[in-house]
Amino acid sequence: GFGSAAKYIASSIREIAYDTYIYDLESVNIIEIMGRDAGWLTAASVLARNEFSLAPHLIYLPEVAFDKEQFITDLKEMVKKYKNVIVAVSEGIRDKDGNYISATDAAADKFGHAQLSGAGKTLEYLVKEKLGIKVRSVEVNVLQRCAGHMASMTDLTESFLSGKHAVVLAKNGESAQMVSLHRLSNAPYTYELSNTPVSEVANQAKEVPVSWITPDHHDVTAEMIAYLKPLVAGEVPTDYADGIADYLDVSHLTKVYGK
């Protein structure tokens, strides 16, 4: 599912950027992406960049400490340079003391009432307070994991192969194992199917290597891009009915309760 979610995130951020560029005024769009303890999906936003657009201009992951003052400094520089700025942030960004940015009363309304919310909304209030320019936050939320119309063919292929490998493991008497894919090469993209004891991965977070985050803590490296690109490759044909994406019959999941 990661490759498909990454594909949706990168595509959506590119579309948000194109929409933003229409307006000739200084603006900031903060996109909050899933990732409480690991920033892989937020890192995937880098794939939105092309020869016409550098969005997202800033990327913040939870693997490194987030500094609000440095964020405002970074943002000022980007607004001065590009006018319209797109920022990608993980929902789980924390300060140097390990406190979630979204858990602080970063801003209060004019009556002094704390406005507590997610990381994106918290930073939106901060930008309004410090810069006073047009700013909005967008919480991608559940959309990033259910956009079936924008699935990655690589992702789908690997899902089926993983399922087949799981059957082989079961037939061989293996149990409490998770199918895993071990990358052999980025280009050409090659990997091998293996398995890992569930006890080694359950309730664990596989963090982004800090070496794949730039020293200034607001972007990712070429190594990250090389890792991500193969995972979003390929398009899955989508069926449509009456102009709307049409999926499997899930009537067995849509019971009517209370009757």
Task: Report each predicted region and the residues it spans.
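Accessory alpha-helical/coil subdomains and C-terminal extensions
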Residues: 1-136
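C-terminal non-catalytic interaction/assembly regions of soluble proteins
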Residues: 100-259
